Amino acid sequence: RTLTQGVEEPLEQARRFYDYITLNVKYAYSRAYFCLEDIPDACARNLRGDCGMMALLFITLCRCAGIPARWESGWKAEPGFCGAHDWAQFYAAPYGWLYADPSFGCGAAREGNEARRQHYFGNLDPFRMAANTQFQADFDVPMDHWRADPYDNQVGEMELRDRALEYGEFLRSKEVLECTEVS
């Protein structure tokens, strides 16, 4: 309530949440999510978290304020680089669903780039490939065994008849083959 005290407009409330996270939370790689009892709470209490933890904290704060918010994750893919990444969406009438990327905003704040920090509230860069629109979503083809990453899988999984394979048991790779500007 303190973050949104005196603010009724959902867009401005969401901005306050984004500002709080990007200006106070430090990026840090996390333990496996199954080791954390409450992921957004861990991020809020420790003021540290990875991209998924920051996105979940933003989503949780929005939802607590009555602002619809949801998860999106996939890859950040640009010439020469491809890596897993998580971000959020929130709903603000009359604009509809908007993006927020607290961890990229946090990185911009750390670098002193306020324009870029502001950009990641309401916008994303064009180098995204969305793979998941829900946190802890089931696969379209259900697995018969325990999943390696039941929280946020962006790279796929494999299983045999008698067990699932762990990530170190099969080869996987990703590569940006082409980046083309479209108009």
Sequence positions of predicted segments:
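Sequence-level detector for tyrosine residue identity
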Residues: 17-20, 27-29, 33, 58, ...
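Secondary-structure boundary elements
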Residues: 1-46, 158-182
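Short, surface-exposed, charged/polar-biased interaction segments
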Residues: 38-42, 83, 109, 152
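Hydrophobic/aromatic-rich core segments of domains that either
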Residues: 53-145
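Low-complexity, Gly/Ser/Thr/Pro-rich intrinsically disordered linker/tail segments
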Residues: 122-183
